[in-house]
């Protein structure tokens, strides 16, 4: 079962995530869109191969979502720190899924 299409999407959005450094409205919109693409792709991969991707779906996806929610509810002074935590959690999970998709081939 090939995962090249999904891996290509994840690699593309992974480079976008690493370029985000500061919290502002534009970066927030970009990272929110990236999160939506990431979560959609993880669900597709889990449905294609539950054995390989269920761990990501059950563990890493909720972890990234918690970081996203922490950013959403944080006070103005904490937003930059929570943005960086969200970005790092998303980036780490993206890299994990990319590696898994290569191994699951």
Task: Give residue spans per PLM region.
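Short, solvent-exposed, charged loop/turn and helix-capping segments
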Residues: 40-60
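Short terminal alpha-helical segments
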Residues: 1-35, 94
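Helix-centric, low-specificity signal for extended rod-like, repetitive segments
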Residues: 2-5, 9, 14, 61, ...
């Amino acid at each position: 079962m090939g995962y090249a299409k999904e891996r290509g999407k994840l690699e593309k959005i992974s480079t976008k995530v690493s370029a985000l450094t500061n919290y502002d409205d534009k970066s927030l919109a970009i990272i929110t869109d990236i999160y939506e693409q990431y979560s959609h792709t993880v669900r597709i991969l889990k449905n294609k191969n539950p054995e390989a991707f269920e761990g990501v779906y059950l563990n890493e996806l909720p972890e990234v979502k918690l970081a996203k929610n922490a950013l959403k509810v944080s006070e103005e002074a904490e937003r930059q720190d929570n943005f960086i935590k969200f970005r790092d959690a998303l980036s780490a999970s993206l890299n994990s899924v990319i590696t898994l998709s290569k191994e699951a081939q």
